[in-house]
């Protein structure tokens, strides 16, 4: 039984059930409710509005049924259950009187069975009804609109019969009875089963090996796949005070019903930096589906690569896209396609690398026909919007910069792929190296080389470390420090393996590089041309035009493109987009065909085509032209900004002093190399100074602050790659701010190393805000060199553990300028308490410590209290969202009783009861400095509040007391009123969220306006 109250309590779950399937499932529930006469015809018409989001219709249905009383609620739950059961094993047999005297009524009573019987025959029935004059041509065309599935067309025919009085209902009742009964579900048809089998085989073959990261051998995905840090994006600012940082998720959470930004959208977005493992994640999804291990709710999975789709020049339809560009049905093409249209909820489409799709997303051109051809970009954009294959799931991967606000409107859930955790790096290396001792030595090398360890949180760098393990373990010099160092190491690895045996033991010396310089320049020219033309997949004709021969290809940087339709000639692509950028930078540094002046376009990150001149420049071919400068400049101007930034950083690294001798031996003119270096230095300094000049003046009374623009981090990265201290000093000379914000900027360990390299030269200390990034423990270690230039450091929501904070504090003890630390929303436990206590005890100029939303218990609070006893400077202490309990509150209260400087204390959401409140009340009686005490979200109850009220009577400093959501009744409020009568200092007492009646709230507010209810 289900009462109306129980029904209302289940409302959110019922909405989830109704919208979790497809529109077909929702309409089958309406069929049942109509046939049981739970819904009237007027109710039904209000629930079948075309174009309305399914969630709106579901809520309207719940409202309609609730108004019909307990019986209606029970019937809806029964209909949901029956619809779920019938989707597994439908009962197609229905019995009705074909010669009924009330045909319209019988059509409604037997509607579910009639819809199922009509499903496979609706086109023939429409033709017959038109021929016999029961419907007009206009009515027939309306029912046959391509946006409707076969079952929806059947329902619309029945709806028409209900309102027409010309015998259509009697005709249908008689004719449908004669139709053959299907003995199985439509997708059990031989054609569909054969197609599903073929599709699984093809997807399994395409996804079993990781060929994109290796030109010499294939790596079995099952053997080396390592979970990446995947977090769901939430709307910042929408969460309450106890909002936790996103938890790391598994692949199975991609289609979870939680965390929806837009529950009516179909598209799941996965964003991550270049090399973070987006393509490999999709490949693992494909493999798990194809081998039957997961994602079996989908009958069909269609993988696509955006870099390959953009090469499709001719118009194509949904059918062409699925069949010609993924998997062709050997038989029954029309039947298979019709099933796909009828069951979109059983389809998953994946689109990898949207950042490599040269067309910018727009929703201006609507295309709703699955059979009419259109351009590839219009087709893709309408699939993502849901105008085509609505309710089919689509997964889109991209680098963050390529995702516009327009596109995010159509995103159901957004995930952030943050790369490997420290444990992930170790696990990956152990999977790659099962020989005794090799993985241990590599892991030890990383742990003792923080710069290299910081790079490896991106899987592409972990792969490089694995690939170059011999070079790393045997080399006498220092380990790679910059991204450029790492790519030169992998270049050395590829060159050695392609060289004669007697040269295989050499490092990347001039002779090894010179021997392959023509090959590298040809590959670099192809890479640059591809970047400028947004071309990442190269045909045989394009390779021939670039004079790239089989010997060049054998070097290993070009591999067969994945996801190629069987039987077609496989085009080639670079191992990874970052390799394409690296080789393009190599060409720009060493080619005699590149004028030095062209390099300035690398550091000017305007959108391609932003000037009239760039739009007038002709499309250029790979071969050189007599206008060399305009050719290179045009390609750089048309390169996507994120690829341009990566290329610029590589160019800066190649022109560093570290690699000067290596490149000078390969460059005919050392003077030319020096000119390029000078040009890059000038461009970097100029771009940074221009950036700093754009900072608006400070608001009167506030510190001058700067929120980094997108290009700022890449300029800093380029400075770091160049490794020139003097240039870093000159660059920050113009930075005159007190607060530097880099929130939500994708700052990882590598970016931390670059920031530290530059910011340590600041003349005036700054407050550095790095909230909502991926700093982690390794990133904290990278930041240590610039800690002396920071007066405040904000690291909210950065996946930092005790180990990282202990290292930070060890260094901070010697940094006189550092006065504030914000560490909330991390993974801190009692294990860091001794270090934090030491910080408080030793730094007598320290002002603010915020440790909210971590995992500190009473034990940690007791240790911290010892540090507080020896501290005389702290003004702000944030502990909200921990688990200190009564014992922890007692320890902190005792330590703060005679503290002379603390003004603000937050213990929100710490499981504090009346015992802890009594200790805090005793503290209030003695403390003469505290101005604000935040105790919301605890369970103080009246006993605890009465104790606090006694403390207030003897307190002369507290101005704000926050007691919201503490189960306080009128008794506790009365005690507070008595205390307020003798306390003129206190200005506000927050009592929101406590169980007061409206009458009590009105009475309390009239008695003292300082009570905020």
Curated annotation (Swiss-Prot):
Whereabouts are the LRR repeats? 764-785, 789-812, 817-838, 845-857, 873-893, 901-922, 929-949, 957-978, 985-1005
Any one GO MF annotation of this record: Hsp90 protein binding
Subunit (UniProt): Homooligomer: homooligomerizes following muramyl dipeptide (MDP)-binding, promoting RIPK2 recruitment. Interacts (via CARD domain) with RIPK2 (via CARD domain). Following RIPK2 recruitment, RIPK2 homooligomerizes via its CARD domain and forms long filaments named RIPosomes. Interacts (via CARD domain) with ubiquitin; inhibiting interaction with RIPK2. Component of a signaling complex consisting of ARHGEF2, NOD2 and RIPK2. Interacts with ANKRD17 (via N-terminus). Interacts with HSPA1A; the interaction enhances NOD2 stability.
Its UniProt domain note says: The ATG16L1-binding motif mediates interaction with ATG16L1.
Q: What does its activity-regulation comment describe?
A: ADP-binding promotes an inactive closed conformation.
Q: Which family does it belong to?
A: Belongs to the NOD1-NOD2 family.
Q: What is this protein called?
A: Nucleotide-binding oligomerization domain-containing protein 2
| Binding site residues for ATP | 272-279
Signal sequence residues: none
Lipid-modified residues of type S-palmitoyl cysteine are: 368
Region feature Required for CARD9 binding, mapped onto this chain: 214-247
User: Which positions bind ADP?
Assistant: 212, 225-226, 275-280, 576
Q: Which SUPFAM superfamilies match?
A: DEATH domain (SSF47986), P-loop containing nucleoside triphosphate hydrolases (SSF52540), RNI-like (SSF52047)
Q: Spell out the subcellular localization from the entry.
A: Cell membrane; Basolateral cell membrane; Cytoplasm; Mitochondrion
UniProt keywords, alphabetically: Adaptive immunity, ATP-binding, Autophagy, Cell membrane, Cytoplasm, Glycoprotein, Immunity, Innate immunity, Leucine-rich repeat, Lipoprotein, Membrane, Mitochondrion, Nucleotide-binding, Palmitate, Repeat, Ubl conjugation
Q: Which organism is it from?
A: Oryctolagus cuniculus
Coiled-coil parts of chain: none
Q: List this protein's GO terms for biological process.
A: adaptive immune response; antibacterial innate immune response; autophagy; canonical NF-kappaB signal transduction; cellular response to lipopolysaccharide; cellular response to muramyl dipeptide; defense response to bacterium; detection of bacterium
């Amino acid at each position: 039984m289900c009462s109306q109250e129980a029904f209302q309590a289940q409302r959110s779950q019922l909405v989830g059930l109704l919208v979790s399937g497809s529109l077909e499932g929702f309409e089958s529930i309406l069929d049942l409710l109509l046939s049981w006469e739970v819904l009237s015809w007027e109710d039904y018409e209000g629930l079948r509005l075309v174009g309305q989001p399914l969630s709106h219709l579901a809520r309207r249905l719940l409202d309609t049924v609730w108004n019909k009383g307990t019986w209606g609620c029970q019937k809806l739950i029964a209909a949901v259950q029956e619809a779920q059961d019938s989707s597994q094993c439908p009962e197609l047999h229905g019995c009705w009187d074909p010669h009924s005297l009330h045909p319209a009524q019988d059509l409604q009573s037997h509607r579910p069975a009639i819809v199922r019987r009509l499903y496979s025959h609706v086109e023939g029935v429409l033709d017959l009804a038109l021929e016999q004059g029961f419907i007009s041509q206009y009515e027939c065309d309306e029912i046959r609109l391509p946006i409707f599935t076969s079952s929806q067309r059947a329902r619309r025919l029945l709806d028409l019969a209900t309102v027409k009085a010309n015998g259509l209902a009697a005709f249908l009742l008689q004719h449908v009875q004669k139709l053959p009964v299907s003995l199985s579900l439509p997708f059990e048809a031989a054609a569909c089963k054969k197609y599903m089998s073929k599709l699984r085989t093809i997807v399994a073959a395409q996804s079993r090996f990781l060929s994109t990261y290796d030109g010499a051998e294939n790596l079995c995905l099952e053997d080396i796949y390592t979970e990446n840090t995947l977090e769901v994006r939430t709307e910042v600012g929408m969460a309450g005070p106890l909002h936790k940082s996103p938890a790391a998720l598994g692949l199975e959470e991609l289609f979870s019903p939680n965390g929806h930004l837009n529950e009516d959208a179909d598209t799941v977005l996965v964003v991550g930096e270049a090399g973070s493992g987006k393509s490999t994640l999709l490949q693992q999804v494909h493999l798990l589906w194809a081998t039957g291990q997961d994602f079996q709710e989908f009958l069909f999975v269609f993988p696509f690569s955006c870099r390959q789709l953009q090469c499709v020049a001719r118009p194509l339809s949904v059918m062409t896209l699925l069949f010609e560009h993924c998997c062709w049905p050997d038989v029954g093409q029309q039947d298979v396609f019709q099933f796909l249209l009828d069951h979109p909820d059983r389809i998953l489409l994946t689109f990898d690398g949207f950042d490599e799709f040269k067309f910018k997303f727009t929703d201006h051109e609507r295309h709703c026909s699955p059979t009419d051809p259109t351009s590839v970009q219009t087709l893709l954009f309408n699939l993502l919007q849901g105008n085509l294959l609505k309710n089919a799931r689509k997964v889109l991967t991209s680098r963050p910069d390529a995702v516009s606000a327009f596109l995010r409107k159509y995103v159901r859930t957004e995930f952030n792929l943050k790369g490997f955790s420290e444990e992930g790096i170790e696990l990956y290396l152990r999977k790659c190296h099962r020989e005794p001792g090799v993985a241990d030595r590599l892991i030890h090398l990383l742990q003792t080389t923080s710069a290299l360890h910081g790079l490896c949180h991106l899987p592409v760098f972990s792969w490089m470390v694995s690939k170059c393990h011999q070079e790393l373990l045997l080399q006498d010099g220092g380990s790679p420090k910059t991204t450029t160092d790492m790519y030169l190491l992998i270049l050395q690895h590829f060159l050695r393996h392609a060289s004669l045996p007697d040269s295989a033991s050499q490092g990347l010396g001039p002779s090894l590089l010179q021997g392959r310089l023509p090959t590298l320049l040809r590959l670099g020219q192809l890479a640059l041309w591809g970047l400028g033309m947004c071309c990442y997949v190269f045909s045989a004709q394009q390779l021939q035009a670039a004079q790239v021969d089989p010997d060049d290809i054998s070097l290993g940087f070009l591999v067969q493109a994945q996801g190629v339709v069987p039987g077609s000639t496989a085009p080639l692509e670079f191992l990874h987009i970052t390799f394409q950028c690296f080789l393009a930078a190599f060409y720009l540094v060493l080619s005699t065909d590149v004028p030095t002046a062209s390099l300035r376009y690398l550091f000017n990150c305007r959108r391609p085509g932003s000037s009239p001149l760039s739009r007038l420049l002709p499309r250029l071919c790979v071969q050189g032209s007599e206008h060399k400068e305009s050719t290179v400049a045009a390609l750089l101007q048309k390169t996507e900004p994120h690829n341009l930034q990566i290329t610029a950083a590589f160019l800066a690294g190649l022109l560093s002093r570290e690699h000067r001798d290596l490149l000078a031996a390969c460059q005919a003119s050392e003077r030319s190399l020096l000119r390029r270096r000078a040009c890059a230095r000038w461009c970097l300094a100029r771009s940074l100074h221009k950036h700093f000049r754009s900072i608006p003046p400070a608001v009167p009374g506030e510190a001058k602050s700067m929120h980094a623009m997108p290009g700022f981090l890449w300029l800093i990265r380029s400075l770091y790659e160049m490794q020139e201290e003097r240039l870093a000093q000159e660059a920050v000379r113009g930075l005159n701010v007190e607060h530097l914000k880099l929130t939500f900027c994708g700052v990882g360990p590598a970016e931390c190393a670059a920031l530290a390299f530059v910011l340590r030269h600041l003349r005036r200390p700054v407050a550095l805000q790095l909230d909502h990034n991926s700093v982690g423990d390794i990133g904290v270690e990278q930041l240590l060199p610039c800690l002396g230039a920071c007066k405040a450091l904000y690291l909210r929501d950065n996946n930092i553990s005790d180990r990282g904070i202990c290292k930070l504090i060890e260094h901070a003890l010697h940094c006189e300028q550092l006065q504030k630390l914000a560490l909330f929303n991390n993974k801190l436990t009692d294990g860091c308490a001794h270090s934090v206590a030491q910080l408080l005890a030793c730094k007598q100029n320290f002002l603010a410590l915020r440790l909210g939303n971590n995992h500190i218990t009473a034990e940690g609070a007791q240790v911290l209290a010892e540090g507080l006893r020896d501290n005389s400077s702290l003004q702000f202490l944030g502990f909200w969202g921990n688990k200190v309990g009564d014992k922890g509150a007692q320890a902190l209260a005792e330590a703060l009783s005679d503290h002379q400087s603390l003004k603000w204390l937050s213990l929100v959401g710490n499981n504090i009861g009346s015992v802890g409140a009594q200790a805090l009340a005793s503290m209030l009686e003695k403390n003469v400095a505290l101005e604000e005490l935040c105790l919301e979200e605890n369970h103080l109850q009246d006993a605890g509040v009465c104790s606090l009220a006694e403390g207030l009577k003897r307190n002369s400093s507290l101005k704000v007391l926050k007691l919201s959501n503490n189960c306080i009744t009128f008794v506790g409020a009365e005690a507070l009123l008595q205390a307020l009568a003798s306390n003129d200092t206190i200005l506000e007492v927050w009592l929101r969220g406590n169980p007061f009646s409206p009458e009590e709230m009105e009475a309390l507010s009239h008695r003292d306006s300082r009570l905020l209810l």
